[in-house]
Amino acid sequence: MRFVVALTGASGQILGIRLIEKLTELGAEVYAVASRAAKITLKAETDYDEGYVREIATKYYDEDEIAAPFASGSFRHDGMAVVPCSIKTASSIAYGIADNLIARAADVTLKEKRRLVLAIREAPLHSGHLKTLARLAEMGAVIFPPVLSFYTRPKSVDDLIEHTVSRIAEQLGVEVDYRRWG
């Protein structure tokens, strides 16, 4: 298994961190990329920094490293997740503005008909946001707002994070054991 995980500047950095951890724990290669804004938000929201992302990923890239292998369709991977995904990044992907590695890799993922999961972290959404997300869904992306699942009777924020990350991994095609409805 080989995945690309991108972190953008939206709130919810811990979801991206935990997804990288989970995928690597399950034996996957994880190629991580973080935007400049993600690095700022990561420090604001967590005790982690860019160095930790470099440590847990198989390979790490900055958003301006456009020559990264996954910027090309010839690089085979099993899917890409943008977690968290800002509206700015979603808009760039939706309209083909591949001006950084994250948008380029997502564009390539879509054109190669691979799984692209976007964990949109914005609320409320105006009609322009919704049209952009609908466009992405029509292009084949999975729009995955990290909505909290209370049917699991979480005892902590970590329980909520774990459940959400497990569901994102599942959208990438990874078999994950987690508590489901019913």
Swiss-Prot record:
Functional note: Flavin prenyltransferase that catalyzes the synthesis of the prenylated FMN cofactor (prenyl-FMN) for 4-hydroxy-3-polyprenylbenzoic acid decarboxylase UbiD. The prenyltransferase is metal-independent and links a dimethylallyl moiety from dimethylallyl monophosphate (DMAP) to the flavin N5 and C6 atoms of FMN.
Lineage, opening ranks: Archaea, Methanobacteriati, Methanobacteriota, Archaeoglobi, Archaeoglobales
UniProt keywords, alphabetically: Flavoprotein, FMN, Prenyltransferase, Transferase
Binding site for dimethylallyl phosphate: 151, 167
A Pfam family recorded for this sequence: Flavoprotein
Annotated EC: 2.5.1.129
Reaction(s) catalysed (UniProt annotation): dimethylallyl phosphate + FMNH2 = prenylated FMNH2 + phosphate
Binding-site positions, FMN: 9-11, 35, 86-89, 121
GO terms, molecular function: carboxy-lyase activity; flavin prenyltransferase activity
Protein name according to UniProt: Flavin prenyltransferase UbiX
Gene3D superfamilies listed in its UniProt record: Flavin prenyltransferase-like
Family: Belongs to the UbiX/PAD1 family.
